[in-house]
Amino acid sequence: MDHTDRAEAIRGKTVRLTWTEGPTRGATHEHVFHQDGTVEWRDADAAGKGGAAKERPPYAAVEVADGVYAVSYLAASGYTLTVVLNFRDRKVVGFASSAKDWHPVRGRFEVVS
C-alpha cells in the first residue's frame, strides 16, 4: 500500500470505545491512533494491570461523510477491526473479523485526548 489515509480527526487521538453489541459487549477499549500511522489498544477496565497492547499495527482512517469516519486495522492475531465512527452522535458500528469469524459490533465512543 503506497498511500494510507489517516484522517486528522483520528490521527494523534485517543478514542475510548464502549461496546454495546458484539463479542466484547460490555467492555471498553482505548485506542491510541499515533501520528506515525500506528494504533495500540488496551482494555480500559484493566488500567494499571498491564493491559496495554504490545503491538502497533498500521491503521487507516478515512472521512466518508461530514463528521463520519471509517477506521480499520489488522492485528497480529489475524483479526481486523473495521468501524465507522459518527462524531455527531458518538456512535460506532462495524465488524471484527478473521479468516474464520465475522462479528458485527456496535457501541459508543469518546475522544479522551
Each language-model region and where it sits:
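Generic "edge-of-domain/loop-turn" microfeature
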Residues: G22-T24, T38, A46-G48, D66-V68, ...
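Contiguous, well-ordered beta-strand patches that form the walls/edges
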Residues: A47-L85
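A structural detector for beta-sheet-dominated domains
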Residues: T18-T20, H34, R42, L74, ...
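Tryptophan-anchored aromatic micro-motifs
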Residues: M1-R25
